[in-house]
Amino acid sequence: MTHNLPYKTEIKVLIFDFDGVIIDSMSVKVDEYKKLMSEFTNDEGKIDKIVQIYKNSIGIPRETTLKKVFKEVLSKNILTVEVDELSRKYSQRIFKRLESLKPLDGFLEYITLHQQLKKHIISGAPNSDLIYFMDKLGIRNKFDSVKGGPLKKSEEIASLIRLDKVKNNEVVYFGDQKNDFLAAEEARVQFIGINANKNLFKGKCPVF
């Protein structure tokens, strides 16, 4: 992560996605998702489709993705209570696998360098997961607010703009997925892509 914001506008608020920006747990999450879905099908073709849906849905509330998987791939109806139980079960599995979790290189130095700015987290990950990981990392007190899914990122960004009483161009959202970029675009704030596929944001924003 770079140490200097690449914008001429005076930046007053930094908003971060979580996974892929502050931590990197994607390989573990994909592996555990495959194991979870293998309880419902042994068809490798379907498992591959499910994993692809999961990867394409990073940043989208987990419950939404589960419902999509059951409807479009497994062709099964699933009750909300069942979705909630699967989400809880999945969280427990990732917690066990991520006991030695650490922030991405440079992140702590970066927020320390910009400690005078307001800092928030907006993520599609369940709020309970966010709090668990941030407490484990010992970084919750470094942020003015933390908001996890289910949510619509662009609406939450707009809400923070009103709360912090700043202009749209005085806010930067850091993300690693296309839906993060689209949320920033919809909220009319600046965007920086972190650890992202450079082709995903080519010519549209800074990528690190």
Each language-model region and where it sits:
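Asp-based, Mg2+/Mn2+-dependent phosphohydrolase catalytic module
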Residues: 1-11, 131-208
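Conserved SAM-binding loop
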Residues: 22, 119, 173
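Short beta->alpha linker loops
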Residues: 28, 61, 102-106, 125-126, ...
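Surface-exposed alpha-helical segments enriched in charged/polar residues
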Residues: 38, 109-112, 162, 182
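Short, acidic loop-to-helix structural element flanking the phosphoryl-transfer center
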Residues: 92-121, 127, 131, 154-155
